[in-house]
Amino acid sequence: MILYLTYNDQPSGVYWSQVTDVVAHLNTLGGPRVRLLALVSARDYFTIRRKIRAHCPDAVVLPMVPQMKRWRVNAAIVALACRWFRPTGIIARGVLATWMALRARDKALVGKVCLDARGAYAGEWEEYRIVDDDALIAQFRAVEREAVLQTDMRLAVSQALVRHWQERYGYTGQQHVVVPCTLGRAHEEHVGPGGAMRSELGFAESDVVLVYSGSVAGWQSFGLLGGLLRGALAEQPKLKVLFLSPPDSGIDGLAAEFPGRVLRRFLQAEEVPQALQACDAALLVREDTLTNRVASPTKFAEYLANGLPVVISAHIGDFSQLVQVQRLGHVWNEGDALPVLGRPVPEERQRCRSFSLANFTKQAHTEAYRTLVAALT
């Protein structure tokens, strides 16, 4: 058995597509059983456990030790789980979970550990202060260094992230695979034309609808986004903007400046595909930070899967070059105006969707997943 360990991750669309769907795919490969072990907040434990088990019925969901500053104590819970399940390996999502898994390996409770790295963790904490605690932030470089250099296998979301490991931590090995953030099941299934949703949202056939899906906080860079959209809305009278986001004062301010042209909706994960298909282009603009230079935003594949060309910043992981080479939208450089946007023809929508399904499904990366599982067996 292999355990897939997550620590302090909240159930969300990202968790379903990047954790529970991955566990389900790994269990189709004919190798050892892979079982999710999720350490979650004790504050809302039963609700979180119910949500996770709805997507992954055999998941082991346990309450973690309260308070982030005591995160290391959770290694004892992981050790107990290893004594019970006797796994051959652990895939650990993030460097904190990896540290816990390495402590179990130190005690010979598990044979091998894989770091499932979703980004540059120390850089992200230093740049965006995920937790406002200097002592905790200061721990991260050493923890990430050990996770990168001492694990038996590594899963990176981008080649840019591997280069970061090489430059910052001196990683020289080849014991890694690169799998970008892949599509969740809801986006793999074609839900049909978005005409009904387009009408429901109040968009006319002559409107050009630019969509942004997700949070606008922190590394999502609303300050940069807001300035760019103000200029575009002023210069392109047919342009309208749809935010599929939680409430935000920045979005409210933009909507007040451009009445009837900026809308916000916050939808359930299963409702998002149809809303995306009602739009004409997608926006993936972020500031130039280490966090974003190694990133693999889940929204990129989702936008393409729903037939949307993407306007993307010039420094987003491996994706900016991909957009340019494969003609999947427009690469935007900070300081430039947003390009004049139009409605894509059906052939362009289908090309975007086909590219996403060919490159961003779990099945498209089966060989990488097989390599990972074999390294832990």
What are these regions (language model features)?
Residues S245, S249-A281:
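Nucleotide-activated donor-binding/catalytic signature segment of Leloir-type glycosyltransferases, i.e.
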Residues G13, S17, Q220, F266-Q277, ...:
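Nucleotide-sugar-dependent
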Residues G335-L376:
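A charged, aromatic-enriched C-terminal amphipathic alpha-helix characteristic of glycosyltransferases
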Residues L5-V22, R43-Y45, A92, A217-Q220, ...:
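A short, glycine/small-residue-rich beta-strand->loop->alpha-helix junction that serves as a flexible
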